[in-house]
């Protein structure tokens, strides 16, 4: 059985890790970095860039460069948070037929799950390159406060990327796993995981207990805000810069998409610099132009100014902390350790606020960017059966229930219930001779169902005629270890039953997922062909270069006819390569022609090398001879220092 990898699918950055024995390994991507920007760019030629290459070109291609898509995953287009993002994002957020929020690139509508799958595929490839074998299984993390739709959409993204998602695990819980297994402290400890990432905020209170040599991680409570994170901090800086520039120059940059993308980069950079320095300068020449000519932006921002701009955002993290402490039934003073997770927790003001609330310094020995992926990898090892000393008891973040008479939300499973869990309750009809009931399932804490998130609805039909209140309908809720809900309704008199896995009125249908999986597989096949074509072209280029070099040095030793034959074959190959031919067989045939024509040249070189005999000359000629000889024979090795850029074609519908 292959390894189960751990993936932290983040709003801003993603990370992949795996276990080697009892050691965890955070894997570097093809660019040599341990985290990968969660940015996907769709290019004019159908190429898809993921990570750092996508980020680098974002300024020139803002409308087709998608970032922070995790904020949209599993969300309805009408939700106020989505509506807010529509005005801020340079790319288009559109309404899908089922009411979900989708995105658009080059006129193609894409599901957030489909876009996130590109990042997951990059993580999968990163792990495969490291292991040298295929990877098919993963544990993927989500914010603890993600609802059912968002969890299901994340699972769908894994499937589209070609991964069997063995478990969806909450990010703070994963960080607690990474922290708890790394520390030698004995006895029971209560920890608070404060997770402020790129787009989401979570707070979890977790108890780590030693039970007969086994570490038991029990989540006591969780709370958060799935629309609060580093992206919002960046936006405050962007808004401030736009306001200052408008005051000075009279130009509104908020309408200029290219300028906005440059501002986003500058804001992120300034925010990072202000975590260590007291002041930073934003300098963006030629940010825009008007009738009077080009305009340049130069602005100093102090740490105090940044803190004033984001003060209310930091304050918004405190109320969830209060609720989590209350729900866990503990006092602030009983918390032994506070763990900071997520890049935004590097901001000194955030750390100060956390210290002020919990009354103690947060731990500094946890890597906020990697802890979540590490925890996911540990859970992967537990699920594969290779680790027996860890037990994880997670909770459902929000209450689940059904709508009953008068639009009331009747809770079936309360928030912070340990999962997996089951609960059944008997209900009856509201009218005489009612032949069917509609079960509407909601998630949330409001008293009235309409104030909560509708997860889905289904009917139980064929109820025998009877006065109201007589039929007995048993509704059962079953939450699995991924936090995903399965609901059933049964008429106890007839035994008629209807069971569903909640897949909201929204979400991707099975057919849509299958199509996206097939598209991804087709793209993988296309990638392979493109890779082979690139190899052939590189081989051709290298052969042209080495043969020309050899001709310059040794051409005068050949007969005129032989030299002309080589030159003609070279010209033919060069033209094919210059025309951008996508016929691999034709390129290989022309390489073979050059190789055959160059045999005499190779012989002359070796003869000359032997005749000279001197070590220096032998070395020089040997190098040239090897180049022409090996490639003339059609060898396909590429120069050691040539790295093929990853690229991928996406077919338009």
From Swiss-Prot:
Induction of expression: By stress conditions e.g. heat shock.
SUPFAM superfamilies: Actin-like ATPase domain, Heat shock protein 70kD (HSP70), C-terminal subdomain, Heat shock protein 70kD (HSP70), peptide-binding domain
Key words of the record: ATP-binding, Chaperone, Nucleotide-binding, Phosphoprotein, Stress response
Keyword tRNA processing: no
Listed Low complexity bias regions: 627-639
The keyword Nucleotide-binding appears for this protein: yes
Family the UniProt entry places it in: Belongs to the heat shock protein 70 family.
Protein name: Chaperone protein DnaK
Gene expressing this chain: dnaK
């Amino acid at each position: 059985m292959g390894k189960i990898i751990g993936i932290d699918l983040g709003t801003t950055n993603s990370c992949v890790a795996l276990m080697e024995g009892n050691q965890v390994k955070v894997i570097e991507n093809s660019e040599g970095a341990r985290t990968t920007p969660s940015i996907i760019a769709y290019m004019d030629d159908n190429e898809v860039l993921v990570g750092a290459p996508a980020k680098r070109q974002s300024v020139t291609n803002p409308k087709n460069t998608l970032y922070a898509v995790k904020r949209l995953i599993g969300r309805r287009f009408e939700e106020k948070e989505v509506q807010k993002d529509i005005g801020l994002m340079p790319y288009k957020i559109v309404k899908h037929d089922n009411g979900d929020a989708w995105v658009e690139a080059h006129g193609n509508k894409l599901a957030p799950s489909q876009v996130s799958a590109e990042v997951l595929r990059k993580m999968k490839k990163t792990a495969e390159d490291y292991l040298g074998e295929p990877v098919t299984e993963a544990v993927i993390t989500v914010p603890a406060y993600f609802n059912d739709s968002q969890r299901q959409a994340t699972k769908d993204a894994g499937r589209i990327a070609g991964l069997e998602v063995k478990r969806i695990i909450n990010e703070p819980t994963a960080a607690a796993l990474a922290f708890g297994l790394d520390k030698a402290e004995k006895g029971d400890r209560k920890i608070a995981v404060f997770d402020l990432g790129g787009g989401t905020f979570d707070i979890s209170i977790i108890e780590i207990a030693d039970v007969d040599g086994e570490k038991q991680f029990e989540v006591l409570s969780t709370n958060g805000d799935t629309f609060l994170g580093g992206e919002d901090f960046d936006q405050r800086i962007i808004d401030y810069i736009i306001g200052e520039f408008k005051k000075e120059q009279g130009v509104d940059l908020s309408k200029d998409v290219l300028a906005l993308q440059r501002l986003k980069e500058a804001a992120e950079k300034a925010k990072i610099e202000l975590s260590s320095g007291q002041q930073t300068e934003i300098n963006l020449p030629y940010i825009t132009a008007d009738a009077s000519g080009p305009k340049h932006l130069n602005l100093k921002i102090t740490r105090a100014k940044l803190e004033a701009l984001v003060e209310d955002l930091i304050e918004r993290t405190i109320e969830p902390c209060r609720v989590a402490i209350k729900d866990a039934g503990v006092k602030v003073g009983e918390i032994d350790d506070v763990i900071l997770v997520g890049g935004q927790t590097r901001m000194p003001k955030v750390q100060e606020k956390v210290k002020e609330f919990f009354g103690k310094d947060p731990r500094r020995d946890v890597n906020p960017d990697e802890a979540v992926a590490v925890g996911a990898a540990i859970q992967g090892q537990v699920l594969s059966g290779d680790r027996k000393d860890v037990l994880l008891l997670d909770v459902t973040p929000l209450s689940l229930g059904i709508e009953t008479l008068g639009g009331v939300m009747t809770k079936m499973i309360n928030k912070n219930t340990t999962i997996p869990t089951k609960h059944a309750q008997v209900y009856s009809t509201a009218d005489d001779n009612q032949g069917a009931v509609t079960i509407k399932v909601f998630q949330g804490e409001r008293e009235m169902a309409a104030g909560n998130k509708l997860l889905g609805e289904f009917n139980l039909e064929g109820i025998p005629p009877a006065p109201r209140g007589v039929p007995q309908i048993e509704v059962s809720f079953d939450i699995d270890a991924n936090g995903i809900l399965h609901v059933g309704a049964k008429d106890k008199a007839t035994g008629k039953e209807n069971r569903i896995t909640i897949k909201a009125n929204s979400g991707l249908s099975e057919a849509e997922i299958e199509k996206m999986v097939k598209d991804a597989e087709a793209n993988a096949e296309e990638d392979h062909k493109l890779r082979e074509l690139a190899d052939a072209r590189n081989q051709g280029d290298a052969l042209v270069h080495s043969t020309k070099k050899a001709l310059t040095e040794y051409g005068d030793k050949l007969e005129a006819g032989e030299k002309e034959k080589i030159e003609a074959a070279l010209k033919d190959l060069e033209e094919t390569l210059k025309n951008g031919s996508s016929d691999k067989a034709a390129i290989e045939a022309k390489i073979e022609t050059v190789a055959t024509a160059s045999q005499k040249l190779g012989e002359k070189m070796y003869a000359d090398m032997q005749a000279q005999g001197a070590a220096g000359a032998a070395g020089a000629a040997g190098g040239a001879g090897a180049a022409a000889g090996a490639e003339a024979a059609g060898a396909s090795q590429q120069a050691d220092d040539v790295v093929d850029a990853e690229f991928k074609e996406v077919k338009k519908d």
